[in-house]
Regions:
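Non-ligating segments of multi-cofactor redox enzymes
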Residues: 1-213, 220, 226-242
Length: 242
């Protein structure tokens, strides 16, 4: 929580800066110009290398939008438990999560295609991320951003209904990170022989409904929040070969 707070306060634009690097590549391709390295790509490159070496820890701890999602979900959870006396953590069924996780790839493809075709300029004022960046910079978006404001509000509502709603379902950078080849030493493992019978707490607690040592095609969906490690009664979940 402390790391998330520090990054939210001091580095709220990391997400948008990283995507600006991706965007600059496709803008150069659209203009039939050589791709030139820039400060945006510095951030993009560093985050991609970190993801390959250590997994999606940026998503888990350093993304301001992800931290906002955590805050919205935990606030909703507190209200449910303290006021409405609801037990347990709420969220979508696994089958629904699996379907919605694909939306971010569709959104990424749409954004990149719109850049390549020159249609991206028509999206001016519609980006909820631009609105969020303005707010974290202490600026109020004007009326031209009304669609972006409305979309941000809808995302905030979604954050209340599912843990890591934006990260899992809508984040275009999350889609990029999820497609990166993550080193095996950065993946979570467990010794199944040490697991209590019919436990399954790690998968139940995972926002993405992932099973440790399960379907490796889904390993990119892990946002490295370490919730599985925290809830394991046997401290049986680890990264690397230990």
């Amino acid at each position: 929580a402390a790391i998330e707070l520090v990054c939210f306060i001091f580095y709220p634009a990391l997400f948008s800066t990283a995507f600006a690097g991706i965007k600059s590549i496709f803008q150069a391709l659209a203009a039939h110009q050589p791709i030139t390295w820039n400060s945006f790509l510095d951030v993009t490159g560093v985050l991609l290398v970190i993801t390959i070496l250590f997994g999606r820890h940026f998503c888990g701890y350093a993304c301001a939008f992800g931290s906002l999602g955590d805050a919205m979900y935990e606030l909703t959870l507190f209200i449910r438990q303290k006021i409405f006396h609801k037990k347990g953590r709420h969220g979508y069924p696994e089958k629904v999560v699996r379907v919605l996780q694909k939306v971010k790839y569709i959104l990424l493809a749409f954004l990149l295609l719109s850049i390549l075709t020159g249609w991206y300029a028509n999206l001016q004022g519609m980006s909820p991320w631009d609105v969020f960046s303005m707010l974290t910079a202490g600026k109020l978006p004007n009326a031209s951003y009304k669609i972006g404001i409305a979309l941000l509000i809808l995302i905030l509502i979604g954050m209340c209904t599912q843990e890591r709603f934006f990260c899992q379902f809508l984040c275009p950078m999350g889609a990029v990170f999820a497609m990166m080849p993550i080193l095996p030493t950065a993946l979570f493992h467990r010794n199944r022989e040490k697991c209590p019978a019919k436990c399954g707490l790690c998968k139940k607690r995972c926002p993405a409904h992932l099973e440790i040592d399960g379907d490796t095609s889904l390993s990119g969906e892990c946002i490295c929040c370490h919730a599985c490690q925290a809830i394991c009664p046997k401290q049986n979940i680890h990264t690397g070969d230990a």
